[in-house]
Design a protein with these regions (language model features):
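S-adenosyl-L-methionine
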Residues: 1-24
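Conserved class I S-adenosyl-L-methionine
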Residues: 27-35
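Helix-to-beta-strand junctions that scaffold the AdoMet/dcAdoMet cofactor pocket
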Residues: 110-112
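Conserved beta-strand signature within the Rossmann-like core of class I S-adenosyl-L-methionine
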Residues: 114-124
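Short alpha-helix
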Residues: 135-151
């Protein structure tokens, strides 16, 4: 695979990710369901080596770049197994993707001081279009509940309507493992 230099297009970066990614401590970050790699490139620009995982080889080709290791894995295939060891990642980033059977293993892959940034669609999004299948929509408070159930400390959580990049109902969370230093969670000023 040819590595090419790609600029980070800050207009396409999730505002949630842009806001909270600076909390991720030094170390490797997983961009799960990375698509074309917009967030992977942003994370590299912050100094992190990134594993960009997706099931689509064409998307991974677009995601490839300096500091990014691409990984072609279909985590929804029958018999699929989570490919990463517990405690591996300083950060895990997921946007616009939900496959509930992955959650426990994914959270276990966070380092003791790791940061989880997750943003995806919620029930009610049907009124705005796809996804509309309940399998791909979080129930009210679901993301917050599973973060707490898995021992994460919530730094920020939102559940509601967004207008950008298109109107949608979403839930999003910034949560940290228990060893994350509380003083490091510098909250942005408005």
């Amino acid at each position: 695979m040819q590595v090419t230099e790609q600029l980070v297009d800050t207009e396409t970066i999730s505002g949630w990710l842009r806001r909270w990614a600076p909390l991720i401590p030094g170390g490797e970050v997983l961009d799960l369901a990375c698509g074309s790699g917009r967030h992977a490139r942003h994370l590299v620009s912050l100094g992190h080596p990134v594993i960009a995982l997706d099931h689509d080889p064409e998307m991974l080709e677009k995601a490839a770049g300096a500091g990014i290791t691409t990984s072609l894995v279909d985590l929804e295939a029958p018999g699929a197994v989570w490919p990463f060891a517990p405690g591996r990642f300083a950060g895990i980033v997921v946007t616009n993707y939900l496959h509930r059977p992955l959650l426990e293993a994914m959270i276990a892959s966070l380092a003791p001081d790791g940061v989880l940034l997750y943003e995806t669609f919620a029930e009610g999004n049907e009124q705005f279009g796809k996804p509309s299948n309940p399998k791909f929509l979080l129930k009210e408070g679901e993301m917050l509940a599973w973060a707490l159930e898995h021992g994460l400390r919530v730094v920020a959580y939102e559940d509601g309507r967004v207008e950008q990049p298109k109107a949608a109902l979403v839930q999003r969370i910034c949560a940290v493992r228990p060893d994350f230093p509380r003083l490091a969670a510098l909250l942005p000023t408005f």
